[in-house]
């Protein structure tokens, strides 16, 4: 039996990050966490590209474009969608998740879902570097691991 696992060594990896500007006080913290995680695991700063988009709904298109360019070993998506009083939240969350998955499957490049989908602003803050850790950091580690496991199949 063969077992394949990625490792957390980022040396030589090229990573793209797509960040939503909407709720930037949260997404900027997710980005800081992701950048810290990438650099601490060996990804060089000059091998990281960051693209800002207006909101979470716009993330999948840019993530797909980055992935299809084949310039990146993985793409990380970062955003924060917080439930409001209307059904808009459900539509945005569903489409961003589907679009992110489609970008990965159609390109063959790992596209990591680092978009917070929370009921409250407090939950988003907790996941952007306080009580619940930083989901940007976690997305960065997932990107490194997935990029490395994909290399085993090249």
Curated annotation (Swiss-Prot):
The keyword DNA-binding does not apply. Keywords: Riboflavin biosynthesis, Transferase. Pfam families: DMRL_synthase (PF00885). Pathway: Cofactor biosynthesis; riboflavin biosynthesis; riboflavin from 2-hydroxy-3-oxobutyl phosphate and 5-amino-6-(D-ribitylamino)uracil: step 1/2. It catalyses: (2S)-2-hydroxy-3-oxobutyl phosphate + 5-amino-6-(D-ribitylamino)uracil = 6,7-dimethyl-8-(1-D-ribityl)lumazine + phosphate + 2 H2O + H(+). InterPro entries: LS, LS/RS, LS/RS_sf. The keyword Hydrolase does not apply. (2S)-2-hydroxy-3-oxobutyl phosphate binds at residues 85-86, 127. 5-amino-6-(D-ribitylamino)uracil binds at residues 22, 56-58, 80-82, 113. Its EC number is 2.5.1.78. It is an enzyme of class 2 (transferase). GO terms for cellular component: cytosol; riboflavin synthase complex. Transmembrane segments: none annotated. GO terms for molecular function: 6,7-dimethyl-8-ribityllumazine synthase activity. The active site is at residue 88. One of its GO terms (biological process) is riboflavin biosynthetic process. Catalyzes the formation of 6,7-dimethyl-8-ribityllumazine by condensation of 5-amino-6-(D-ribitylamino)uracil with 3,4-dihydroxy-2-butanone 4-phosphate. This is the penultimate step in the biosynthesis of riboflavin. Forms an icosahedral capsid composed of 60 subunits, arranged as a dodecamer of pentamers. Belongs to the DMRL synthase family. This is 6,7-dimethyl-8-ribityllumazine synthase.
